Amino acid sequence: MIKDPFARLGLDREVLTVSQLNGRARVLLEDVFSSIWVEGEISNLSRPASGHVYFTLKDSGAQVRCALFRQSAARVRQALKDGLQVKVRGKVSLFEGRGDYQLILDTVEPAGDGALRLAFDALKAKLSDEGLFSADRKVALPLHPQRIGIISSPTGAVIRDIISVFRRRAPRVELTLIPTAVQGREAINQIVRALKLADARGFDALILARGGGSLEDLWCFNEEAVARAIDACVTPIVSAVGHETDVSISDFVADVRAPTPSAAAELLAPDSSDLHRRVDNLHRRLVSRMQDRLMRERLRLEGISRRLRHPGERLRQQSQRLDDLDMRLRRAFEQSMHKKQVRLAHMESRLTAQHPGRTLAFLRQRLDALAERLPRAIREQIKVRKLQLQSQMQTLNVVSPLATLGRGYSILLDERGHAIRNAAQTQPGQRLTARLGEGELQVRVEDNHLTPVTLSLLD
């Protein structure tokens, strides 16, 4: 047990000098905080010529000075910089001359999003050097796709938003969901398999979509395996991962990046009303150009007529030519008008066929079919979850600490209930508790061997 260096203060009115106070404080801090882990953000980083590294570790409410001496700094693999979130290990010490305490560090590791951001930047640079982000690899999206594959979670707002956009803008487009997990380690292989399956089914385009989340939540879309699977697809892919401010490796590799899943759907959903307006505009432009052509020919004929010197046979020939041109122009105009009218009628019939009432009836039939399948799917899922739970319970029983104790091992606890991991944590004569598979023993430390002791396995 650590002896309190201030135990006598207040009893016999011992008066300390400032140096004595700081010296005792340093001993106390180094004994109590001899090896601790602390997490925070680096700021005020400096690297003097000595090779040591000094910085301030802070969070939203406090800060502490840190020193990483040259030998320890050489073991740090990550490039340290201001703003990096890190986990550090070291001891608390006090600089007696100023009375300031600081952390003397031996280990620095990136923490949280800091580590993920380093991995993101490294993979981005690697794939960029390989040319996976090059514009030459991008495939243009089809103007009027008829079959679209959606790679996303089957539940949640994302798939509902995409379906809503297509129902409003292009209800006749066939949508197929290739379900996959979109978060966690298992999502990586599922997304890769879904991309390969969708690419082989001959869709006009694919949407890879997921809602917003933290960098860790979206991390499966920053995996190299997913990026290479996207690059290997022949089918054009729109990446719609997260919110507008979220950027993933998938966005760089895909043919087009959409800020949201709804925006991805709008990129691929042709607007029926817009098509109707375009047909009307083309019709007006055609009529205007035909009228301009007819006017130019008439003016040309009038000019020729004025240049005629003898009205005889030449006049009759020009008159016949004019009649012929007039007939040809009228016939061409009528044919063109007929074609446009037929096309317009066809477009009107298509618009009629896409009436919301028909779509609603189709969706009601689909809803009824899904309602019949839902109870059976729920029962199957419950059965699978029960089997998984039983398997996990068996695994927990195998790795349980109590099972380890049951095989003859024990755990030594000090008087505060802390586990003893090495002999340096004990003192001769110290009372310890040995927890066994069944019951406990009170033991006393006779001696502590601070050097490793080799145990013979043959005795």
From Swiss-Prot:
E.C. no: 3.1.11.6
Among InterPro entries, the record links this protein to: Exonuc_VII_L (IPR003753), Exonuc_VII_lsu_C (IPR020579), OB-fold_nuc-bd_dom (IPR025824)
EC class of the enzyme, as a word: hydrolase
Q: Which GO terms describe its biological process?
A: DNA catabolic process
User: What are the subcellular locations of this protein?
Assistant: Cytoplasm
Which chemical reaction does it catalyze? Exonucleolytic cleavage in either 5'- to 3'- or 3'- to 5'-direction to yield nucleoside 5'-phosphates
**Family according to the record:** Belongs to the XseA family.
Oligomeric form and interacting partners: Heterooligomer composed of large and small subunits.
What biological function has been recorded for the protein in this entry?
Answer: Bidirectionally degrades single-stranded DNA into large acid-insoluble oligonucleotides, which are then degraded further into small acid-soluble oligonucleotides.
| Entry-linked HAMAP family | Exonuc_7_L
The protein here is known as: Exodeoxyribonuclease 7 large subunit
Q: Source species, please?
A: Pseudomonas syringae pv. tomato (strain ATCC BAA-871 / DC3000)
